[in-house]
Amino acid sequence: TTVTENVTSLAGVPSWFLVLLKHILKETGKNDIHEIWPNLELFIHGGINFTPYREQYRSICSKGLNFMETYNASEGFFAIQTDPMDSGLQLMLDYGVFYEFVPLSEMGTPFPKSYSIAEVDMHTDYAMVITTNGGLWRYMIGDTVRFTSLNPHKVIITGRTKHYINAFGEELMEHNADAAIAS
């Protein structure tokens, strides 16, 4: 079985993988994943925000893990974390995806302006629009991103186009709420 193998890396959705790891700990009677896999050093994750899960992973991995994020969806594979010390995800500009970015402030207007990768700035939350070689044409995937670097182009995922509170103009983004809950 896998518990007897030399596992050095894991990849998956954080919420589901945490359930699996806790089950493995329960079945083996261990308290720490490194008691089972002493050479485990990397967890590649994506699909959901990792912030609410980080401390839970640290609590069951005594030697620590390197966490690296990917940004993928059913519509394509968009970005990867290239440095464990930098949360920015580098956009993959050569994966058959053409990107456009619509400022969140333009959402809901009759003719929202979109910006190319060359026109973005680092202080704006954007809805991401993609055109792919698989046939999607100006498809809004529903995610919002903010650029953390323009050379190379790196983003953080700030939420969903429909997941923010704006009762009084505060535009509370999902990532801010997640960070507050995690602290």
What role is predicted for each listed range?
Residues 1-183:
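Active-site glycine/GP-rich loop and adjacent strand/helix microenvironment
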